[in-house]
Amino acid sequence: MKSFDSYRKWKYTKFLSNKNYSFNRNYILNIISSKIITDAFNSISKWKNYKKTPLLKLEKLNKNLKLNNIFYKDESKRFHLKSFKALGGAYAVEKISKKKKNIIISSATAGNHGRSVAWGAQRLGLQCKIFVSQYVSEERVKEIEKFGADVIRVKGNYENSLNECKKLSKKNNWNIVQDVSTKNYSYVPLLTMAGYSIMIKEISKQTTHYITHIFLQAGVGGMAAGVVAGVAKYFKR
């Protein structure tokens, strides 16, 4: 068992399975609409240096595991962020900046989401404040600072950094771009999720193979939700 902070311990013992799983396409697209997903692609595909990231076939791993095909979507090639979360935060920044001019962007992050938000603000000439917990490495902080953001380190864990972000954003009238939805905050997270759906749009054009499983890392679940929405939109099987 590894301790990550002063009061919480985590232990990984087994894979978890959702016994109530049901892929309801209409239900999914009622949450993240087909229009929002389409708008995300139409916007991002016009960005400078946009191109599909590679879909690599892992031949050796296929053979060793005796599977038909394993593909790897290499998001490290997305723009110049070297991050698997380049799409969502930057797209949300662009959308909200069209409704409000000369805004200051803020966000709490453990690394990758904040990098996208910072880059999204930089490309539009906006100020950006990124909040991180004391556990975020200096390397990640430097990657965020490369895109011109002010990084505020907060004592405690991610929740503490998020609470501080909310408090100071309200006080200073900053605009929060977060990938976590709450009761009164869902539009911006939906935009963020829609940005990630582009990965599935690209995959649908990069292979004709029947995709049976998709594996991805997930924290708060924004990217995972965006991928599921992309599957509902672009995979018809």
Task: Please place each PLM-identified region on the residue numbering.
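PLP-dependent amino-acid enzyme catalytic core
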Residues: 1-237
